[in-house]
Amino acid sequence: MRRITFLLFAAAGYVLGVWTASPRPRAETGASAIARASEAPPLDGSRGVHLAMNLASKEKPKPDAHDGKLRVICFGAHPDDCEIKAGGVAARWAAAGHHVKFVSLTNGDIGHWRDAGGPLARRRNAEVRHAADLLGITTEVLDNHDGELLPTLENRRTVTRLIREWRADIVMGPRTNDYHPDHRYTGILVQDAAYMVAVPFFCPDTPPLAQNPVFLYYSDHFQKPYPFQADVVVGVDPVIEQKLDALVGMESQFVEGGVSGSPELIAGGEPKLEERRKIVRESFRKRDRGIADKYREQLAAWYGKEPAGKIEYAEAFEICEYGRQPTKDELRKLFPFFAAR
């Protein structure tokens, strides 16, 4: 019996020695890891895209936080929300040398009539990266499932850290009254961070902001419990084609229709797709033209009556009461576009 036990221990020791002596494969980094992650099937829904998304978001070096330029971070629930609501003003800031980051709190992995999971999440991540290149900004997609975002403590910490790490002067997000639960909870998470970004011992691993940012809501059409108030309206005529290019490039959502699409929508190959691209472009053009027309009086307050009358496209924002409350002079510094169309 002792001899058998001894032999078993000896065999185990030999196997352990061989295992420890064998070289371990080196972890892949950079582009090779992104390629590997995009090829491998996800193990759990969209979780397989986590590595690819994190690496993709870190490809660009962070801009200098002390270069005297404005720093803006915009939050959306899905990979397209920020681009729709603030793509124009983001492009204007970026063209003036300021730093803008878009963050999607979910990976959009159920936002299509045909595709889902990791393949769709990877596709949508690629779409926002392309849009970011067109707009001149930085983008990041977090690995939360589409349709499952909740205002948890961990998500509050994540949003707080992102705002602090960006050293934001301006933070944007949706209002909390919205048809989509992910939109509502994105609004809540951004609101919940509005005070916490300055609290030293909340997320002490990231330095608190010395000055609370100005928090702004995107425009919407919801009326209850109260309608959107257009405190700041920015003309986006100089960058409207950039914005439209970015949105048309999100083909999974707009050309193919996202969750509301169907095979019939894109049947007919490239000619049909090109027709759809034109329809999408004109639809978003009409949207931003409608904002300019609706808030013409507010445009006049910022630009003057005559210049405001010439503005064809606009984006509008409401000041959140939870962040810093800027004066009109401060807003002119934060939105340095009002001296020109």
Residue ranges and their predicted role:
Residues K101, T138-D220, F228-Q229:
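Internal alpha/beta domain cores that form substrate/cofactor-binding pockets in large enzymes
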Residues I34-A35, A40-W166, M196:
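Active-site rim/loop-helix segments in enzyme catalytic domains that contact anionic ligands
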Residues G88, N177, H221, G323:
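Flexible, active-site-proximal loop/turn residues at the rims of small-molecule/cofactor binding pockets
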Residues I34, A40-E59, D64-G68, F201-P204, ...:
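C-terminal accessory domains and tails appended to enzymatic cores
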Residues H112-D115, Y226-A230:
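Short acidic, glycine/proline-rich loop/turn micro-motifs
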Residues D80-C82, T106, V128, T139, ...:
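Divalent metal-coordination and catalytic microenvironments
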Residues M1-P23:
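Sec-dependent N-terminal signal peptides
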Residues S22-A37:
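Ser/Thr/Pro/Gly-rich low-complexity linker/stalk segments immediately outside membranes or between
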